[in-house]
Amino acid sequence: MAHNEAVDVVHVVLVGAGIMSATLAVLLKELDPAISLEVVELMDSGAAESSNPWNNAGTGHAGLCELNYTPQAADGNVDIKKAVHINTQFEVSKQFWTYLTRKGTFGSSKSFIAPVPHLSFVQGEKGVSFLKKRFELMHQHHAFADMEYTEDKARMAEWMPLMMPGRPADEVIAATRVMNGTDVNFGALTNQLLKHLTSAPDTQVKYCKRVTGLKRNGSGWTVSIKDVNSGSSRDVDAKFVFLGAAGAALPLLQASGIEESKGFGGFPVSGQWLRCDNPEVVKHHQAKVYSQAAVGSPPMSVPHLTPVWSMARNPCLFGPYAGFTTKFLKHGSIMDLPLSVRAGNIGPMLAVARDNMDLTKYLISEVMQSMEQRLESLRRFYPEAKAEDWRLEVAGQRVQIIKKDPKKGGVLQFGTELVAAKDGSLAALLGASPGASVTVSIMLELIERCFPDKAKGEWATKLAEIFPAREKVLETDAALYRKINAQNNIALELVEESSETQSYA
């Protein structure tokens, strides 16, 4: 194997060319144009894994329709705090895209974001009772003031014309609608950010490169990188390393040996969709519609029927149907899971296996499903669905977080977690949903944790320019929320300037 003895030196190495690394790299260059960066990616293009539109159909997460973000307690109370927070996180993402759009970083923002109504749909007395309580609470908050609720089937036929024909006349159903939802093509956005990076000084984006080693080097790191085509290797010294490699972030984090990585494990879950390209079907469904997960199913199983506007012919996807594989990436190895087992995480992993038999049964049942059984699930949404219009499409991998827990030994965590070295020299992003939609908030958290002095000092003015309002104030200040939201919507071409009173999320 050829090895280059010369060691390259950069300020920052980012592993993985997805939305996380692309966002962090562009943000760092805005804060310090002199910073030197290298992005390394195993595949031959950016956004090849979780950021790819086929692998990430749950986009535009703003808490408008995703019912798992508003859980109902045993006493019947509905908690909307998470939905409010995710909504404001998405608004922070929009502030960053607005800033870049105004700078001319992108051509038209229409290439990656578009207005799409967000609907929630429920069945049965319990479902209707829950949705009504959820609406009554959310409608009072300024972020959801435009939400509509109905139990009227004629009105629902206007909102979701594909889903209403063929239903029993006495079926108990309800829906909410927010007209000003969005859909985001994170693949297109990622590639635009990466293209922008390649034109910046002291910045490189390199493909077909595998990180084979991470070693401490004083206050920084030596990153060993192998070219998967030629077999040659090189070392890069960096003051800061970000592991944004989707499911592959966990083994890389483990390879770093930092104390903060101890006890983390990963539980890989694969995804599948039913896909429809028939234009006669697709034209009748132009909204994201989310429902409730079946009793005993994990949050990742929340069913939804959604158009993918960013693709040719704008297909519809329904799902997700879960599966199990030991791969951490769609293009990964079946050895990913077994090789991630360590003395420090085997306890939490066994505890999760013990305490999550329902999840195990669910995944087995999903894997064993026939096409006809999958169509039965679809017909809850779309009663007149025809088998010949739909085909199975493989989606991306999700690696749910397993972490130590003082009481249970280990817990399975649905969400994202930023793990950072105590000295701020390395950080990794683990987990899944809401993921891409709140990327900017997560990267801001990383900057504040790993570069605290600069965030409060020399970068503070620029951060305030890019982000005039952060999550906490957006959650509580209705007037400011409406102002920021309106500015973002105009800049991102979600509304005409004369319509600026509308609130898009």
From Swiss-Prot:
Pfam family, one: Mqo
Keywords: FAD, Flavoprotein, Oxidoreductase, Tricarboxylic acid cycle
Catalytic activity: (S)-malate + a quinone = a quinol + oxaloacetate
Keyword Flavoprotein: yes
UniProt xrefs under InterPro entries: FAD/NAD-bd_sf, MQO
Biological process according to GO: tricarboxylic acid cycle
Source taxon at top rank: Bacteria
Cofactor(s) this protein cannot do without: FAD
One Gene Ontology MF term: L-malate dehydrogenase (quinone) activity
EC numbers: 1.1.5.4
Functional pathway: Carbohydrate metabolism; tricarboxylic acid cycle; oxaloacetate from (S)-malate (quinone route): step 1/1
Entries under PANTHER family matching the protein: L-2-HYDROXYGLUTARATE DEHYDROGENASE, MITOCHONDRIAL
Similarity comment: family membership: Belongs to the MQO family.
Record's protein name: Probable malate:quinone oxidoreductase
Taxonomic source organism: Pseudomonas fluorescens
